[in-house]
Amino acid sequence: MLLYTYRSFDMELPTVDIKDADYIILGLPFDGTTSYKPGARFGPVLIRQATLNLESYILDYDIDIAELKIADAGDVALPVSIEDAIKVAVETIKEVRSINPRALPIFLGGEHSMTYPPVKVLEPKSYVVFDAHLDLRDSYQGSRFNHACVARRIHEMGVKVAIFGVRSGTREEVMFASQSGIEWVHARDYNFDAFVDLVSSLPEPVYVSIDVDVFDLPLVPETGTPEPGGLGFWEVIEALEWLTKRKKVAGFDIMEVSGDRLGNSTSITAAKLLFYVIGMSAR
């Protein structure tokens, strides 16, 4: 067991030791800066529980992910303070990478502020994020590491940022994006060609973040800041399939899964997304 981790719930998948894995799953259960609907700290365990409902065989790829070398490293025991949580998450991710630097890491959240630690450790050149929100505030509710600021903090690392499925933001965020060369696509304007046009020129490796609020609301009612008018499941899958075939991926995360009951539609959607991400990465 890693220094700061614990096992919350076993997935419906056989797992291997971290050192032997091709894919490593790590939960980041934190919702300390949530501004509307708390519960994202339960996201990792809810996703794992939802895997009980799913077949491990991916029809689309003729791949059974139960036959792959997957390690579940557990969940990181994160402090309540966002600054302290970031420090512990960074230290734990570094420990995982020291054991196995070649495996593809997949992080389960947890609010979107928890995307910052993986990006800090993995140092990608580009950040592709599916999100209903721009998350480009400089500060929110007294913190520069609030979930509403994560894309801005990542941009400040010198990482190229591209945001898809947006339908919420402030005038200041839109102006900052324009002035800073940050590309984003409104959910109303999103299509596969728009995604390809923007992502084709991004430098590698790419870190991919999926805030589940990017999906249309009936799919993901249990999330921290829900918004109507989102993308469909297959729209996101199609984009990820293209990206994983053509770009080197540094890591993935699935963030902002919330709720307080087993089998809610948000956690099932996220678990299915997790299985597809693993399957498409193994093609």
Curated annotation (Swiss-Prot):
A divalent metal cation 1 binds at H112, D131, D135, D211. Pathway: Amine and polyamine biosynthesis; putrescine biosynthesis via agmatine pathway; putrescine from agmatine: step 1/1. It is an enzyme of class 3 (hydrolase). GO terms for molecular function: agmatinase activity; metal ion binding. The keyword Isomerase does not apply. Homotetramer. Catalyzes the formation of putrescine from agmatine. Cannot use arginine. This is Agmatinase. It comes from Pyrococcus horikoshii (strain ATCC 700860 / DSM 12428 / JCM 9974 / NBRC 100139 / OT-3).
